[in-house]
């Protein structure tokens, strides 16, 4: 149990890579704040399944990365539980598939807001707690899209 007695915050953990990270951290004994935009029945079922299987604590945190006020509120809710944050995994992202010349500036700004600025803001708030506790690791999840140049994903 590599992460026993560790507390992690994971964004975007309802599907894909984030879901796998959530499962891996759970399997290794971490207490996890599972951050998602929407807590639906499928996500609740996943959390129940993981906590039964691995006997760890998973606390769902719902907020929209488009809203800085909601980001701050989510961080306050996390910190209110007085669990020092050992690990922050920024995984949440959005993608828009269209050729570059057909992608509006508004859409580009929206993607950058979620994929970069909101994650940076979230990290700044969590980092204050890590500095106070004199410990913590921050992981930013990325994809290979920047390297392989997938057609229609230049905004991503």
Predicted regions, residues:
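Conserved glycine-rich cofactor-binding loop
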Residues: 7, 14-15
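Conserved glycine-rich Rossmann-like NAD(P)H-binding loop of the short-chain dehydrogenase/reductase
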Residues: 28-45
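Conserved NAD(P)H cofactor-binding loop of Rossmann-fold oxidoreductase domains
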Residues: 91-96
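Substrate-binding pocket helix/loop in short-chain dehydrogenase/reductase
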Residues: 99-100, 107-112
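Active-site loop-to-helix junction immediately N-terminal to the catalytic Tyr of the SDR YXXXK motif
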Residues: 103, 149-156
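A short, exposed helix-loop element centered on a Lys and neighboring polar residues
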Residues: 123-124
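Residue(s) in the substrate-gating loop at a strand-loop-helix junction
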Residues: 143
């Amino acid at each position: 149990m590599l992460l026993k007695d560790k507390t992690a915050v994971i964004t975007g953990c309802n599907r894909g890579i984030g879901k796998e990270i959530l499962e891996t951290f759970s399997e290794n004994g971490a207490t996890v704040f599972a951050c998602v935009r929407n807590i639906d029945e499928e996500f609740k079922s996943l959390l129940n399944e993981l906590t039964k299987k691995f006997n760890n604590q998973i606390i769902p945190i719902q907020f929209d990365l488009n809203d800085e006020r909601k980001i701050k509120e989510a961080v306050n809710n996390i910190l209110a539980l007085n669990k020092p944050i050992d690990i922050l995994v920024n995984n949440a992202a959005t993608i828009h598939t269209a050729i570059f010349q057909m992608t509006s500036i508004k859409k580009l700004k929206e993607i950058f807001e979620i994929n970069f600025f909101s994650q940076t803001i979230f990290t700044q708030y969590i980092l204050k707690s890590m500095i106070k506790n004199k410990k913590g690791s921050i992981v930013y999840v990325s994809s290979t899209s920047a390297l392989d140049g997938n057609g229609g994903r230049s905004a991503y």
